[in-house]
From Swiss-Prot:
GO terms for cellular component: endoplasmic reticulum; fibrillar center; nucleolus; small-subunit processome. This is U3 small nucleolar RNA-associated protein 15 homolog. WD repeats lie at residues 36-75, 78-117, 120-159, 162-202, 204-242, 246-285, 287-326. GO terms for biological process: positive regulation of rRNA processing; positive regulation of transcription by RNA polymerase I; ribosomal small subunit biogenesis; rRNA processing.
Amino acid sequence: MAGYKPVVIQTYPVLGEKITQDTLYWNNYKTPVQIKEFGAVSKVDFSPQPPYNYAVTASSRIHIYGRYSQEPVKTFSRFKDTAYCATFRQDGQLLVAGSEDGVVQLFDISGRAPLRQFEGHTKAVHTVDFTADKYHVVSGADDYTVKLWDIPNSKEILTFKEHSDYVRCGCASKLNPDLFVTGSYDHTVKMFDARTNKNVLCVEHGQPVESVLLFPSGGLLVSAGGRYVKVWDMLKGGQLLVSLKNHHKTVTCLCLSSSGQRLLSGSLDRKVKIYSTTSYKVVHSFDYAASILSLALSHQDETVVVGMTNGILSVKHRKSEAKKESLPRRRRPAYRTFIKGKIYTKQRDDIVVTRPAKKHLEWYDRDLKSFRISKALDRVLEPNCVIKTPEVTVSIIKELNRRGVLANALAGRDEKEITRVLNFLIRNLSQPRFAPVLINAAEIIIDIYLPVIGQSSVVDKKFIVLQGLVEKEIDYQRELLETLGMMDMLFATMTRNGSAPVWEHVPAELPEEKTESPRQPSDTDKNS
């Protein structure tokens, strides 16, 4: 008796993900470390100087974390209400933050009590930053004002009242100590010059502005609000360079890579998009478990920190290069160990015995071998098999149809079992690689269960969905046939006209008397 031949699972080519340099670069991070904060993480900012600690603003506290620590190395909690936008100075020695009560506080990293308190805003301060000269602080608040403060004298220098709604974001120029940019819920982004009493540039974003970013060169400005990220050319008077719409929800934060070649944006849709600053196309993306409020990159992009609405801080560190450890040298086996048995000369009376390799059958093959056809079909309709390896399910259905027992395997099923079969058909019927097998299976199911249609509302809904899917597929086929007909007509026209293009009409030769030009009257005719 011949042995059982396992079912051949038909394999299909799978298009792999395109591997780029950005994919390799941004995937080279370890598993993220998650830290639970006391509230939503509204701001994350890295110190520009070693050891590159980062400040996390959440609830009424500011935590300073070491680059690789999971516990804060310092905490600032001298806030009466919610703290906002803790930002390091360029030398990493000072930290400035706003608060819900409108007070701007300046801290020394080595101390705990605030060095300075700037009081002048009447509502919550959501954005603060140091100017390029390190001696001034810019702040924007919900009282629609932007203020410039002097650190040594603890005094207010200028107040700009040109926004008509909350000022929620801003940044100072890294090159010019007199220039800074603010974004507001009045849909505008404005650039101010401390040497004047009004804005020197204003652009219309079109949505409430949640974040702004000024390139280190000062030539480009990025604004984020709504689902849009817009890039403006400041050297051309604020001309819109490109408008990006790659998020599904509001964009809340922006960040620039260390090299300045990649722009990162975080959104409430739980995604971080990475754009090329030359083509402004998405080159990579990260997915997170909750909506994103803040985002920061450390020096040389070694660490990515993301703050979320649920108070979770996600920290990812770049993988270190594997170092080859010098292992003790093993003693090599003697030469006779390798040639043992290879130089044996077969004798005439020797009998060679080969041990056949034992083949292990899959569970569905064991069921088919024992003629348990319904059990075999049930095994390949399990959720794990249906989702991960649908080609196995299709191959078993094809094998049952080849044996002529597919109708027997599908018959006699209850509501739950037939629903699983219909769900698989709905999921995969429109795929060209599975369609020939599944269409036949669908016809058999309809023939078997047609007399009992109407007895189960769940099964009836599945049949209605299957009917709609088939009708949609028929419409697609009709459109394809119409397209093929038009293409055949075009090809026929090209063949009939020879080398003439399709869009050129080559007229047939006309009789000679119709093509000659009218005779010009002679001088004799004119005189007569």
